[in-house]
Amino acid sequence: AFLLIPAYLGLNTTASANRVFPKAEWYGSIWDQIKQLFYLTKPIKNQQFDGGLNIYCGTICFVLLFVYLLNRRIKLWDKVKNVIILVVIFASFNNQLLNYIWHGFHDQYGIPNRFSFLFIFLLLAMCCEVLMKLQKKDILSVMLGIACGYAFLILATKKCTLEKETLLWTEIFITAYAVCMVGFTLTKGMWKRIISYVLLIVCLVETTINGIKGYDSNGYVDISQY
């Protein structure tokens, strides 16, 4: 009480004490945020618009997420709860009230949606889980997942404003991941290990180049600017 009461009284003298809950309104189109999942999209360094976010975590997720949903050996309840959490977090990126709650009942400033790492972590965890469980008998779910990944890309091109370079490289990477995952699913032993290394190399190349491009677009690569 000796610590909490002075802290409470002190907070009541700040500007935050006079704020009220924002309305449950949307910042804009959800497709503008889905766009940030794509390769070579410009990351946010500092932005006054509260609806921006950084959620890029690899093109492979476009395929593995659907493979995860179609895989029968992953429990239905696990799929449902993980998808619900993903949807709630993603909706929170675009909703003023939910965003306010995620930021500890506080308005965000400068770097919006700082809790996006939770979305990235869960998405990658789901993708990793299904990748580790793939077996030869899962080839149908893998092929359907790949088809869904391409369908998602086609839909995104109609809803999002994607640059030609982003679209081209996304198609290339999805195709590369599709080939690797089919091979990974159908093979065993040494060949499966080799394909897993190829898959790892493709992922590293993609994310490394995207990271370099991201730093370059924000002006942190040129030493003369320090």
Model regions and ranges:
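Contiguous transmembrane helix-bundle modules in multi-pass membrane proteins
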Residues: V83-Y100, H106-Y226
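Periplasmic/ER-lumenal interhelical loops and adjacent helix-loop junctions
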Residues: A1-K81, V88-I89, N95-F105, P112-F117, ...
